[in-house]
Amino acid sequence: MSEFLLIEERGGVGLITLSRPKAMNALSLGMVRGIAGALRRWKDDPTIHAIAMRGSDKNGPFGNFCAGGDIRFFHEVAMAGTPQLEDFFTEEYALNYLTHHLGKPLIAFLDGIVFGGGMGLCQGATHRLVTGRTKMAMPETLIGLFADVGGGYFLSRCPGAAGQWLALTGQHINADQAISLDLADWHIEAAHQTAAWDGLQTLDWTKAQALDTWLQGHTVAAQAGPPYPDMHAWGLINRHFSHATVAEILQSLDTDPDPWAQETAAGLRKRSPVMLHVALEHVRRARTMSLADDLRMERDMVRHCFHSAHLGRSGAATDTVEGIRALVIDKDQNPQWNPARVEDVTLQMVEPFFQSPWPVFSHPLKDLV
């Protein structure tokens, strides 16, 4: 059990509170293991009728859900070359899979920050509740990584070209945008979350409509409307991010005088050129994959991110560790990507990220079906 988790059972509900406010509930290996252990136990417990998850901030429950994986930890263990890095990704991805296969309601209160690993933790929930404070993102390309934790699976199933846009740019989206892109289900007032959380624990689970009645009393369902709250941006997303390659996307953005297009192009050029190509190919491949196959592919990919043998790099020499250094460790915001330009990335640099370093029978996630 992790010191950063509060795990309880009340009123037939399994309750998980992420409680690492100084790190915006970034997931440690201990937290991953604690959450997975609780979910596995409750999955087969007939006295647990539903499971709920929330985060906390310095003021108490709610405020932020989860800022993702602990990237300081990633840097530390990558530099040290310890096996904990391998353990983290294997166990985190197995947890992501588990959240989709509990066989009972999983209610995620997605208040505040919901980034990266937080998205992986919540996208398998049957009930994803967002607030006016919600900020969702898959910002991994900013640190030379890709949208993992099942990101290929759930982003590739967003409408239009939204998945490619989110995977490449790491753009933050709000509650209404998340609902429109099928990344959330219901809106709940931030101030009403405590009452809703407490109310879950008083339901009569012998009544088939108990959870539906609770939802009606505490949330607002998505309303029929335009496919995206900002229809101007929606048109630009689909126009530019439907192109087949990163170079074509950038060329399309560069030739569009719209400020949105110019800002987006400038943002993309701050990302790792190699990982932009990898991230786009990842979403395209995942579109026809099961969740299990996508997670296995992502496990292969993340291994190559920290051990890019085909590029002759490992540890600090990889774009991933360099990106973490620049963003989080030294905070100079000046990563030295290799290569430095999108135009210099070749297929030979990208394709090996999708080749498994393990035979099928010994893959770390071979048991996912």
Regions found by a protein language model. Name each.
Residues M1-R54, P364, L368-V369:
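Conserved CoA-thioester-binding segment of acyl-CoA-metabolizing enzymes
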Residues I16, M53, D70, L121-C122, ...:
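Hydrophobic/aromatic residues within transmembrane alpha-helices
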Residues I16-S19, G34-M79, L98-F109, T131-T134:
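A structural preference for short, pocket-lining loop segments at secondary-structure junctions
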Residues D57, T99-I143, A147, L166, ...:
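Glycine-rich beta-to-alpha active-site loop
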Residues I71-L110, G151, V350-P359:
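An acidic, glycine-rich surface segment that forms the CoA-thioester-binding/catalytic face
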Residues D148-A210:
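Contiguous mid-protein beta-loop-alpha structural module that forms a pocket-lining wall or clamp
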Residues L183, E189-R271, M275:
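Amphipathic alpha-helical blocks and their helix-capping loop/short-beta junctions
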Residues C305, A309, R313-V369:
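C-terminal amphipathic alpha-helical interaction region
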